[in-house]
């Protein structure tokens, strides 16, 4: 009997279901093609015939997007796998679950859905009101009395892929106290669909070339190079200014950075700019980098050879400069007037006097170049820098033309360089006779010398320097010892301490008047009178030493002690060695 009652109940339920489907089909003929009936009527779940928006329709459904924070204020529902009934059906799961528009009925989940491959979904179909796929059962819902349910609030707007919409059916005040999201985030404003993510984070434009050139003109070389690292693209004029700035700065680090940016530019094949790079590295005393740039140049001109030879000569490598000159002639390049000026500079560096005269003769005889004033001055520089002052003076007098003031001025500088005071005074007189305006220059007060802020003393001290002396140190030491015995003999009687003889001689060297004279000679120009004031009586050894010093350096030394003034001139004192 119980089995018959179960069959009747099932048949009665099917009749009601068939009537509902026929009514829905007659109301919306366009949906008739979307219905598919399988062998049993239980394949159509009643849930798909409802348009109610349950709060947990997205739960465990991979096809629907995740709802926002305020659309899931209720805890997840649990269902009995056997009875398929909600264990929390006595508790409202959403604000609209027991509304009058739903007829006060709890939706039942039964049957199989052909949309899911014949399997029953855990919570029924997806709701179009909550961003899911459109259900196949559109139109009027028979469970709502044949009318479409009306929901209070506006239809959610879908602004983008993030589905940042607000469900007006669920109010913030009705959120359940049983469930709190772990990470509550504020809803983000919708982003326009035609706005790309790259436009959200705007990148600052690279610095302009004018900014780099402006910093170079203000001598802010480091800041200018930092703009290159930030993406500035210098043009040809900007590279010229950068190379000149690095050459004046004499900083190898900055020069290499600028050269790296130059190699990445489109001007790396410009011969003029490459010549400036050679000159820049030569000023920074980096001959290796200058030679590397010179070797990698495809189109070398005469300026390239001249600049490389000058870089060798300025850094004391005159032999390499002369070898480069021979290599240039082997390549078939004909030297010009400027070429021989660099050759004379290289000869002066290595002391090649004979070689300089040979090149001077070949310039006239072999290459047909008429010597100019610059070439005669170049040969004079070879003689003067090597210390052959007598030969240099005779060379000036044997010139085929009347010497100008430039020759006598150069000769005066060479005499001052080697400490020949008499020759220096004589050359200055000849210079003034030829050009009286030269004498006026010394009377005009000159401005204080500029501070060389561009020079990095730490960098210059880290270089390896090589010094050469033409005489042997042993012979020079013997000569100095011999002169010491003839010219000056320390008088140790004025040392009252009980120490040995050598210590007494060392103690005499640290008397205050001697230190003052040494400091004055270093800091003052030649032949300037020095005045030393002392509060004690000058000792006899210092008195004898100052007389000899006044004759050697050619100055007038005035010493004031607690007794009187001592005027030392030409090895004599005004006191007559009595004070």
Curated annotation (Swiss-Prot):
Main localisation: mitochondrion
Localization terms from the record: Mitochondrion
Compositional bias segments (type: Polar residues): 56-71, 78-103
Residue ranges, compositional bias (Low complexity): 117-136, 148-199
Entry superkingdom: Eukaryota
Cystine bridges: none
PPR repeats mapped onto the chain: 235-269, 270-300, 301-335, 336-371, 372-402
Pfam families (UniProt xref): DYW_deaminase, PPR_2
UniProt xrefs under PROSITE patterns: PPR (PS51375)
Keyword Repeat among UniProt keywords: yes
The keyword Chaperone is assigned to this record: no
Keywords of this entry: Mitochondrion, Repeat, Transit peptide
Residue span of region Disordered: 56-208
One of the protein's GO biological processes: embryo development ending in seed dormancy
GO MF assignments: mRNA binding; zinc ion binding
InterPro entries: DYW_dom, Pentatricopeptide_rpt, PPR_At4g14850-like_plant, TPR-like_helical_dom_sf
Transit peptide: 1-49
Region of interest called Type DYW motif, as start-end residue ranges on this chain: 485-579
Gene Ontology CC terms, in alphabetical order: chloroplast; mitochondrion
Family to which this protein belongs: Belongs to the PPR family. PCMP-H subfamily.
The protein, known as: Pentatricopeptide repeat-containing protein At2g15690, mitochondrial
Higher taxonomy: Eukaryota, Viridiplantae, Streptophyta, Embryophyta, Tracheophyta
Gene encoding the protein: PCMP-H66
């Amino acid at each position: 009997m119980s089995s018959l009652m179960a069959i009747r109940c099932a048949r009665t339920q099917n009749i009601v279901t068939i009537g509902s489907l026929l009514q829905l089909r007659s109301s919306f003929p366009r949906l008739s093609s979307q219905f598919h009936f399988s062998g049993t009527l239980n394949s159509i779940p009643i849930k798909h015939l409802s348009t109610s928006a349950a709060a947990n329709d997205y739960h465990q459904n991979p096809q629907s997007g995740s709802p926002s924070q305020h659309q899931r204020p209720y805890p997840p529902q649990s269902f009995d796998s056997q009875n398929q009934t909600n264990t929390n059906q006595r508790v409202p799961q959403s604000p609209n679950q027991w509304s009058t528009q739903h007829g006060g009925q709890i939706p039942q989940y039964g049957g199989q859905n052909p949309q899911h491959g014949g399997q029953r979904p855990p919570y029924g179909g997806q709701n179009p009101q909550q961003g899911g796929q459109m259900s196949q059962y559109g139109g009027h819902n028979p469970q709502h009395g044949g009318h479409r349910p009306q929901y209070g609030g506006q239809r959610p707007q879908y602004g983008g892929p993030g589905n940042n919409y607000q469900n007006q059916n669920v109010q913030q005040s009705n959120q359940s106290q049983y469930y709190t999201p772990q990470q509550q985030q504020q809803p983000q404003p919708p982003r326009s669909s035609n706005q790309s993510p790259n436009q959200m984070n705007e990148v600052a434009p690279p610095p302009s070339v004018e900014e780099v050139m402006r910093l170079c003109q203000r001598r802010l070389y480091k800041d200018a190079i930092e703009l290159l690292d930030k993406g500035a693209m210098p043009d040809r004029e900007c590279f010229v200014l950068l190379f000149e700035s690095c050459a004046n700065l004499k900083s190898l680090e900055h020069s290499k950075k600028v050269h790296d940016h130059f190699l990445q530019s489109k001007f790396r094949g410009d011969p003029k700019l490459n010549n400036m790079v050679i000159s820049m590295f030569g000023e920074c005393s980096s001959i290796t980098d200058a030679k590397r740039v010179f070797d990698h140049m495809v189109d070398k001109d005469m300026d390239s050879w001249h600049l490389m030879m000058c870089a060798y000569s300025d850094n004391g490598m005159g032999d390499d400069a002369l070898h480069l000159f021979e290599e240039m002639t082997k390549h078939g390049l004909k030297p010009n007037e400027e070429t021989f000026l660099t050759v004379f500079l290289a000869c002066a560096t290595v002391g090649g006097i004979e070689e300089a005269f040979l090149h001077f003769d070949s310039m006239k005889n072999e290459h047909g170049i008429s010597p100019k004033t610059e070439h005669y001055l170049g040969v004079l520089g070879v003689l003067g820098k090597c210390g052959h002052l007598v030969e240099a003076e005779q060379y000036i007098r044997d010139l085929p033309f009347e010497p100008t003031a430039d020759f006598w001025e150069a000769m005066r500088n060479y005499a001052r360089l080697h400490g020949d005071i008499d020759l220096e005074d004589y050359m200055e007189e000849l210079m003034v006779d030829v050009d009286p305006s030269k004498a006026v220059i010394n009377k005009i007060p000159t401005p204080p010398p500029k501070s060389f802020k561009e020079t990095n003393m730490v960098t210059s001290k880290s270089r390896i320097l090589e010094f050469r002396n033409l005489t042997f140190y042993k012979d020079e030491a013997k000569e100095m010892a011999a002169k010491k015995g003839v010219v000056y003999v320390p008088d140790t009687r004025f040392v009252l301490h009980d120490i040995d003889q050598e210590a007494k001689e060392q103690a005499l060297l640290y008397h205050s008047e001697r230190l003052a004279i040494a400091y004055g000679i270093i800091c003052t120009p030649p032949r300037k009178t020095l005045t030393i004031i002392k509060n004690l009586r000058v000792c006899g050894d210092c008195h004898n030493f100052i007389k000899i010093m006044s004759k050697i350096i050619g100055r007038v030394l005035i010493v004031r002690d607690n007794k009187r003034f001592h005027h030392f001139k030409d090895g004599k004192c005004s006191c007559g060695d009595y004070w």
